[in-house]
Amino acid sequence: MAKPKILIVDDEPDVVTLIGHALDSEGMESVAAYDGISALDIAESESPDVILLDIMMPMMSGYEVCQQLKANPETRHIPIICVTSAHSTEAFARCRSVGANALLTKPFSPAELVAQIQRQLAKTEEQETT
């Protein structure tokens, strides 16, 4: 089985590096985007298995990126996990309203991150076999 490819979208390089190391240690491949525009391009060209999307980014928020990814026939099938430091039902509702598949609140442990990604991968695999 090929390594799952995860697109990490975050404007903080240190966060991208930490997440990338966690994913690598779990046998996953990571691809990085540091802004929303790059995320849209990379999602289309790389076809990741899951997108880990920070909500609070300059120029284009994660909400906008998620909405555009879900509107694009080439990327709408990719599960998106929104990452936010907002611990509110409003943040969760807004993520869902733009098409996110899951929400992960900061701070999170590497184990929580990997478990959430594995859940999304399992759901995708289940949908492909039915």
Whereabouts are the PLM-identified features?
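Charged docking surfaces used in two-component/phosphorelay signaling
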Residues: 17-25
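Short hydrophobic/Thr-rich beta-strand motif most characteristic of the beta2 strand and flanking loop
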Residues: 27-34, 42
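Active-site beta3 strand of CheY-like receiver
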Residues: 46-52
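Receiver (REC) domain active-site loop signature in two-component systems and cognate sites
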Residues: 57
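C-terminal output helix
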Residues: 108-117
